[in-house]
Amino acid sequence: KKVRKNLKSSYFYNLFTNFFGKYKKSYSENFGEDLFVDFFFKEFKKGSYVDVGCNLPKTSSLTYLLYKKGWSGINIDISKRAIDLNKVIRKRDINLNISIGKEEKIIDSFIFYDNCSMNTVDKKFKEYTRKSVNKDPEVVKIEQLKLDSVLRKYNMNKINYLNIDVEGNELNTLNGFSLNKYNPDLVSIEIHDKT
C-alpha cells in the first residue's frame, strides 16, 4: 500500500510490482535498491556479500534482504555504534569496525553522529558534510586495511555481491581490492559528485 501511495501512476505501480513483486519490503534508504539486488539474486538460495560502509543492520541496508534469505557476509563500517548494532542483529555475519583503503595504517575518521550515513574518512567529504549538518565531527582514529587483506583473513574466496557506500572514499577502497581475483556477480557503488 505504501508503494502504491508513493507511485501516483498505476502504470508505474504495475511496472514496479511486476518487476519486484508485491509483498517485498524495502530496507534501503532511497530507491529500493535492495529490491533490485534481491531480484538479481532470486535464483540464489545462499550466497555471500561484502558491505563496505554498511551503516545500520536493517534500515538503509542493501544486504538485509539477502541476510533474511540465509546469506551471510562481511559488514564494514567506521561507526563503532553501527557495527555494535550489526553484531546484535546480524549474528551470522562478520562485523568489522575498520576503514578500507589502498594502504594499511591508522587514519582519522570523521564521525558526525553515531549512525550517520555521512560519516567519512575523506577530508573533502567531511567539509561538505560539516557545512550540510552545521556540526563539527568527532575525529576518531581507526585502522584502515585493504579489502584483499580482510577477505584473506576471513577465508572469503567468492563474493556474490559487493556493496561500497563510503562517502567519498570509493576509489581508495577499490584500490585495495583485486576485482579480477574475487569476481563478484554484482557490484554496487554509491558515488557522490564533486563535493
Where are these regions (language model features)?
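Phosphate/nucleotide-binding beta-alpha loop and adjacent structural elements of enzyme active sites
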Residues: 1-195
